[in-house]
Amino acid sequence: MLKKPSSLEQWEILGTSSGEFRCISRDCPGAGNNNREPSISTRGRTSSSKMVLPHPKVAEEAVGGPQSCKWLSCGLQGTGGGHLEGHPPRVSQESAPAGHTGISPSSSGVHLIQAKTAGWPQRVSSAEQCLLPIQHVPGADFLHVFTLRLHCGPARNAKLVEALFNSNSSC
């Protein structure tokens, strides 16, 4: 069941079809331009922007030692009302740049994962790649609630997306 986050803020993220991945933690050792996956071809028109716009507070509040990122590939099935419901059929931890060996239980901060969307309205390419912000909590096994505002397509139609993942899910 989807629940509304009580304290998390909304994050404004631009949809991208470049296959780009970027951790927005300032302490992440691989957060430079080389921190990306290979480009993935998509059909139809998608957002021309390749920028990720982190919330201003993220960079300021990302503290502690070097952050590491776990690259995930989770399937998301679109539902009515502009929401996504998580149906992760599999998770793959792909080859990652040096310093990106997975999220440690002691790490904190916000990380971006790349997710492939499915079941969107026709105006959004079903193959579009989107970057999702994930808040990792020290002591938690992996993921918890995140909220984001997703901008897709040439018109950057905004959708409010709420999803809930936790360590008990298949993701």
Curated annotation (Swiss-Prot):
<feature type="region of interest" description="Disordered">
    <location>
        <begin position="27"/>
        <end position="53"/>
    </location>
</feature>
<feature type="compositionally biased region" description="Polar residues">
    <location>
        <begin position="32"/>
        <end position="50"/>
    </location>
</feature>
<protein>
    <recommendedName>
        <fullName>Putative uncharacterized protein LOC100128554</fullName>
    </recommendedName>
</protein>
<feature type="region of interest" description="Disordered">
    <location>
        <begin position="82"/>
        <end position="108"/>
    </location>
</feature>
